[in-house]
């Protein structure tokens, strides 16, 4: 099924609105049933709408005041890339590490692929060392926790 530019932008705006509202179910509903969320800083891959929903829900626990400002977005074919700044406060556990209460303002880039009237996948990049420095997480502990999470998820 060919997805038009207008349809892609409608799906994308619905998704962004859901993320900003911390509505993990609505954010995940914009994905194809076999959609994938790739979190490159940790190496974690979430496959299927339920796993994607849980990923969003976990991020809202880790950073309950999480938000983002999109500086720019570019759509080419069936792929949209946007970049900006992720903001929030480390008020909840992150990868099992205790909250620090420290704020973050983290530059990010995300690429979103579309297929059959939905998001086929999203890939998120940011610098983990920058997150650790801002939030006060020990980098080595985050690396170890990421490795353990990948092992548990079979990624």
Feature locations, PLM:
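C-terminal and inter-domain tail/linker signature
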Residues: 1-155
């Amino acid at each position: 099924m060919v997805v038009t530019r207008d349809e892609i932008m409608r799906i994308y705006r619905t998704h962004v609105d859901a993320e900003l509202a911390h509505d993990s179910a609505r954010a995940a509903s914009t994905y194809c049933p076999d959609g994938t969320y790739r979190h490159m800083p940790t190496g974690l891959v979430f496959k299927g709408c339920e796993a994607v929903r849980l990923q969003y829900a976990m991020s809202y626990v880790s950073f309950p005041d999480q938000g983002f400002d999109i500086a720019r977005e570019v759509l080419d074919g069936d792929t949209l890339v946007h970049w900006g700044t992720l903001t929030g406060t480390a008020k909840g556990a992150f990868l099992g590490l205790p909250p620090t209460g420290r704020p973050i303002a983290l530059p990010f880039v995300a690429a979103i692929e579309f297929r059959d009237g939905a998001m086929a996948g999203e890939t998120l990049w940011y610098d983990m060392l920058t997150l650790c420095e801002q939030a006060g997480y020990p980098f080595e502990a985050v690396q170890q926790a990421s490795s353990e999470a990948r092992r548990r998820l079979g990624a």
